[in-house]
């Protein structure tokens, strides 16, 4: 492909034929039509599509994967990357993060989300689940970046009835706004922050609203031992039981963390069909002292997927790195090298994540949304290629992603992303201004 052709491949959807790419089982061709879907995939299909493809991409030396799904993050917190590290979780939140967030503006969230989308595109993520503030600005950023997102307003009432009313109205407004966009890549969710920041009344409202609107629920659950103990002391029940009582556990629910779930809670989440987002890097960095009970959740029937959390506590959005950390943490903590094998970790970041977010099946099959990435095998870390899943999980990083396609649109080709320098400059400026505002006496 010539330089001129490379420039032309960006922008509106094009019909693209990817030839001789390895899908993990062997070389195949993939034809993406101009209608945003994978219309054909298989050996030697180039013969019947070569004449209709606007662009032909030589996939030799690359692995094709479904686009990855990040099922828990706070995208705009990319502006807080490196701002506060090596602290106890509650101190980190109360002393550094929440005071800084009090100075956030809609413009900050826009540029922080653009920066996060840029990083995700670079590392092969085509869909993410986001909870934060000024989410109309986040939606604008996602729309312009070209990837998929499930967005919710972080509902926090702290037991205050007046604040709860404001949070309800903010949630309703965001859902109406996103539906008004009529963008198939951007969906809305209800976002009760956590059982320790939202009253039972607020939790019940979110549960009822999600049922009425048929939208997902995104919530933090049992991240630390302290929040579990506090919940038992305050409500005489563990967090998962409280959420169930409030009508918040269903197949629409994505619960992040889950480090301190017990066996009964794992069984309950499985029974309710909940998706649980494992965020191992953030959990280890903030020392939550326990790993997600992965085996118990899977055995119970829960859909276990993968998330990075925000850049303030990770500090990146690279799901390749997260797959490796997840697999290693499970093996180390549970003292069993067979737990969370490489194909399972890959499934968490692809099929399981797509299922949780409601964006297709996370598979490379005819008729599927054209969300896929090409990962180079021509690197030391991917040589030799005895086992594709093993290399992808244990050996390579997101820097091996060369091409990212979402909804049939090429967002990155040969590591080039149009407009990258402007996003980097604007995001850096927004971060600097945010910190200055927070440090200026009122």
Swiss-Prot record:
Which enzyme type, at the first EC level? Answer: hydrolase
**InterPro entries documented for this protein:** Amidohydro-rel, Deaminase_MtaD/DadD, Metal-dep_hydrolase_composite, Metal_Hydrolase, MTA/SAH_deaminase
Signal peptide location: none
- Which residues are noted in the entry as substrate-binding? 101, 193, 223, 309
Residues that, per the record, bind Zn(2+): 72, 74, 220, 309
Entry keywords, A to Z:
Hydrolase, Metal-binding, Zinc
Catalyses which reaction(s)? 5'-deoxyadenosine + H2O + H(+) = 5'-deoxyinosine + NH4(+); S-adenosyl-L-homocysteine + H2O + H(+) = S-inosyl-L-homocysteine + NH4(+); S-methyl-5'-thioadenosine + H2O + H(+) = S-methyl-5'-thioinosine + NH4(+); adenosine + H2O + H(+) = inosine + NH4(+)
The pathway is:
Amino-acid biosynthesis; S-adenosyl-L-methionine biosynthesis
User: How is the cofactor bound, as the UniProt entry phrases it?
Assistant: Binds 1 zinc ion per subunit.
Q: Give the EC number(s) under which this enzyme is classified.
A: 3.5.4.41, 3.5.4.31, 3.5.4.4, 3.5.4.28
Q: Which cofactor does it need?
A: Zn(2+)
In terms of HAMAP family, this protein maps to: MTA_SAH_deamin
Instruction: Spell out the family assignment given in the record's similarity comment.
Output: Belongs to the metallo-dependent hydrolases superfamily. MTA/SAH deaminase family.
What this protein is called in its record is: 5'-deoxyadenosine deaminase
Q: Which species is this record about?
A: Methanoregula boonei (strain DSM 21154 / JCM 14090 / 6A8)
